[in-house]
Amino acid sequence: MCNLGVDFHDTISFAPDFFKEIFRTWGTKRYIVTGTPESRRGETIKQLEDMGITADLYDELLMGYEYNKSEMTIDHFHRMKVHKLQIIKDYNISIYFDDNPFYVEYLRNHNIIVFQTILNDKYLTEFENKNNFFTCNLQRGQFKYLADGESGQNNES
């Protein structure tokens, strides 16, 4: 039994039609996992519906803990990765999609098949200009090692 978990922001919201089709055809439980606080459940459901992700396509929306955006320091990401792992374990999710390299790195060694949604530069630029707390900009440096390797900067001396 392979229950599916998919992050909302910058995963489903990046490719809603793709995930709509996966949800529609998935044979077991389908969960949307978000770090968004429970107090914003109604707003989150509305955003999902606006993308065509209706309640009949998933089994449950699993929310994050309460926090203020001003608390989004590195400590927040450490707590959220543990929170997401607990949700994934509690709901027996064995396949999980998330865009955030911080979470992907943590989850990949916990007996979960993890897929990372890779965001294109256009999307990254559009959303980092809209929201100072936009976290998928963590992907900006993710491929720097490859670019540095092509330019010879990764060569060991």
Over which residues does each language-model region extend?
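Alpha-helical substrate-recognition element adjacent to the catalytic core
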Residues: 1-74, 78
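Residue-level preference for short coil/turn positions at secondary-structure junctions
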Residues: 26-27, 89-92
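Short loop-to-alpha-helix "cap/lid" segments that border enzyme active sites
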Residues: 48, 77-90
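Acidic, Mg2+-coordinating phosphoryl-transfer loop and its flanking beta/alpha structural elements
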Residues: 91-133
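Active-site regions of enzymes building and remodeling cell-envelope glycoconjugates
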Residues: 27-34, 44-53, 110-115, 128-143
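Non-catalytic pre-domain segments flanking phosphatase-related domains
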Residues: 1-5, 138-139, 143-157
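Conserved glycosyltransferase catalytic-site signature
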Residues: 9, 81, 85, 93, ...
